[in-house]
Amino acid sequence: GSNATAVWAAKLGMNLQSSTLKDDETGEPFHIQQAKQIRAYRQAWAEAGHTRQPRVSVSRSIFALMDDRDRMYFGSSRNESDSVGYLDEKTRAIFGRSYAAEPDKLIEQLKKDEAIAEADTLLLTVPNQLGVEYNAHVIESILKHVAPEMGWRDRNA
């Protein structure tokens, strides 16, 4: 969606879920545009005078490369940059990059994502076609090897 849609949602008192696609309104990298969208949403929320705190979530495809299987699925075909396209003849959209790297590199990359820093919640998109067992591995790898360093989860959890 657009920044205007996020502002509209804030005025109505709705929480914001911003996924991996938004209108390309400035030509800047996806994470910067999404962070600006979140800031516009929060400002509109404050101006509307709502009494509760809003919730904002963003979605990301994040894969910690832990073994040969991870490298086979995500290591060589990493989409390390945003993609741009048109939803219709007037609407230019930007699709956020995927993150796939060894945990230490992944942490460095994720710390630079402004929208992740602005959000209250991070939703992980997982490749459900690869099955429950593999997706449990993907999520566990993030929880154990990335989340503690990002401050998302207690190291002892």
Segments predicted by a language model, with ranges:
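Active-site-adjacent structural elements that line small-molecule/cofactor binding pockets in enzymes
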Residues: 1-157
